[in-house]
């Protein structure tokens, strides 16, 4: 996915050279957290039967963002005429899989246990391979532009669901 995204980014940057009076914004988002889609349904599938389970070793960083913050960030970027270029839309505090699962389990009263990888793969399919990757992403440019997140970390994001 990242390779495809980078190829698209290069294409947009080429277009920007042809249209110098046009403001281009590329928003890279983390996994959205809300009740209906994004990362939440995957976590719900993995944590069936009242058991919380992490994916991978639990130390990998997972870029997440509350859907409300993501929507506000896009609005901010499109309405602030000084914003252009590439922006990461992720929570300002990096979250590990362990932190996400702990917050999820604590919020929904689940017991944390290890679940065998084949069972998790059966529940979520190929999404497991994406969630096993370590991806440390911060929204530095977005914050420096003046954007303020309502939900800053995994606990705040998941508690708001």
Give the ranges of each region predicted by the language model:
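Residue-level signal for the nucleotide or nucleotide-sugar donor/cofactor binding architecture
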Residues: 34, 62-68, 95, 137, ...
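NAD(P)-dependent short-chain dehydrogenase/reductase
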Residues: 7-16, 23-26, 30-61
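Non-catalytic, hydrophobic alpha-helical segments
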Residues: 70, 74, 89, 100, ...
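Hydrophobic "lid"/C-terminal helical patch
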Residues: 74-78, 104, 158-161
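C-terminal amphipathic/interface module of NAD(P)-dependent oxidoreductases
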Residues: 110, 129-161
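Alpha-helical substrate-binding/gating segment
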Residues: 44-53, 59-89, 94
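Alpha-helical membrane-targeting segments
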Residues: 42-63, 106-136
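Mid/C-terminal beta-alpha module of Rossmann-like enzyme folds, strongest
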Residues: 80-126
């Amino acid at each position: 996915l990242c390779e495809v995204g980078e190829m698209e980014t290069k294409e947009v940057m080429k277009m920007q050279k042809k249209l110098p009076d046009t403001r281009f914004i590329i928003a890279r988002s983390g996994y959205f957290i809300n009740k209906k889609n994004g990362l939440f349904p995957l976590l719900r599938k993995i944590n069936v039967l009242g058991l919380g389970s992490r994916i991978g070793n639990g130390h990998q960083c997972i870029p997440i963002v509350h859907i409300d913050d993501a929507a506000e960030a896009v609005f901010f970027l499109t309405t602030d005429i000084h914003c252009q270029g590439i922006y990461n839309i992720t929570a300002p505090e990096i979250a590990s899989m362990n932190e996400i699962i702990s917050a999820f389990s604590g919020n929904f009263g689940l017991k944390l246990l290890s679940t065998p990888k084949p069972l998790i793969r059966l529940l979520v399919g190929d999404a497991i391979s994406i969630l096993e990757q370590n991806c440390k992403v911060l929204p530095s440019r977005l914050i420096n532009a003046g954007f303020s997140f309502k939900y800053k970390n995994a606990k705040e994001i998941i508690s708001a669901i």
